[in-house]
A protein has these predicted regions:
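Charged, long alpha-helical assembly modules
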Residues: 1, 231-324
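Second-shell loop/turn segments in exported
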Residues: 39-43, 109-116, 139-146, 190-193, ...
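Signal peptide-directed extracytoplasmic domains
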Residues: 79-134
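Soluble oligomerization/assembly scaffold segments of membrane-associated complexes
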Residues: 130, 135-241
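Acidic/histidine-rich, surface-exposed loop or edge segments in extracytoplasmic proteins
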Residues: 35-41, 101-111, 133-137, 187, ...
Length: 324
């Protein structure tokens, strides 16, 4: 009886844990839908008054209709949001606006000052925002002077948490890890023959989608599972011979960390990624000519497992034949 009671309690605990995982993954979008009817603005604390006005204009601020209080990202706020040491000398110029979109609208990111966001592209921001748990929203980024743009998402985290979203530190870390990986790999390969930033962004979207599907069908993924999903996807997009082995390992490490995240439990995660993929492909001209856009990394993983299983069975049958 005690054993049955223990098993029942364990089952309830597992069910509650699963529900909490899904809730954590969808909480961000719920807050956006309920709170961001009016857009919210987060400005870098290093802006002068003139730069502040210039940035607000770029972001589309309208004082007569945008009545929510402006937020400021200070070094102290940044350290708390990002869980890093407080550095009072930190210069923060990147600013952002976030507003809700209809539930049928895809996630949008627009950089209003592309000449000043030197390292991060709109699609990189979109990929990282999906990892954070954003499904449909419009994010606008601007800066009055050249900056890398890697800290711009911190303003979004700040705004979301100030409005009640529970954003797990692990999800913020993953989004930042992804943003850094994408921007670094892009910068290091920008002028390399065969490299295409659109392919990298779509490949990463497929990798994340493949991880989510594989985890749903298999449960916890091994490092070998994750490595296969990454390597097969990069090969499909003809990036495996373009980016370096070290860069591939950076993507594998990110994918391995993501494979342990609750965000993969979100039912809308793969749909949001597919919307992102279709959006990039539709605007990429001939970048994806002769590329299999229906590639399924999870299916490739299943096929690989079936092949190994068949190979093992063939070996067993071979040795059995000697004993017959």
């Amino acid at each position: 009886m005690r054993k049955k009671l223990f098993l029942s309690s364990a089952a309830v605990l597992l069910a509650v844990t699963a529900m909490n995982s899904v809730h954590a993954a969808t909480d961000v979008q719920k807050v956006i839908d309920e709170t961001y009817v009016q857009p919210e603005y987060v400005l870098g604390s290093s802006l002068s008054e003139d730069q502040k006005n210039q940035t607000l204009k770029k972001l589309g601020y309208n004082a007569s209709t945008d009545t929510k209080e402006l937020k400021t990202m200070t070094p102290d706020v940044y350290s708390k949001i990002m869980n890093v040491a407080n550095d009072s000398s930190l210069q923060l110029y990147s600013s952002a606006k976030i507003q809700k979109l209809g539930d049928k609208s895809p996630l949008e990111v627009k950089i209003e000052t592309p000449e000043n966001i030197t390292k991060v592209t709109q699609d990189m921001y979109r990929n990282a925002a999906v990892t954070l748990g954003v499904e449909h929203a419009k994010i606008t980024v601007a800066a009055p002077i050249p900056v890398t743009g890697e800290s711009a998402l911190a303003g979004i985290y700040y705004s979301l948490e100030a409005n009640g979203a529970k954003v797990p530190q692990a999800n913020k870390d993953l989004a930042q890890e992804e943003l850094k990986a994408l921007s670094d790999i892009n910068a290091e390969n920008k002028d390399k023959t065969g490299y295409d930033a659109n392919k990298l962004n779509v490949a990463l979207a497929d990798i994340k989608s493949g991880l989510a599907k594989a985890k749903e069908s298999k449960g916890n993924l091994t490092e070998e599972d994750v490595r296969k999903i990454v390597e097969d996807t990069l090969k499909n997009y003809k990036l495996d011979q373009v980016i370096t082995g070290n860069q591939i390992n950076i993507i594998i490490n990110f994918a391995l960390n993501l494979s342990k995240s609750d965000i993969l439990s979100n039912a809308d995660f793969t749909k949001t990624l597919n919307d992102l993929k279709q959006s990039i492909v539709s605007q990429a001209g001939n970048s994806f000519k002769n590329i299999n856009l229906n590639f399924d990394a999870d299916k490739a993983l299943e096929d690989g497992g079936n092949f190994l299983s068949s190979l093992w069975q063939a070996i067993v049958n071979f040795f059995k034949s000697f004993g017959s």
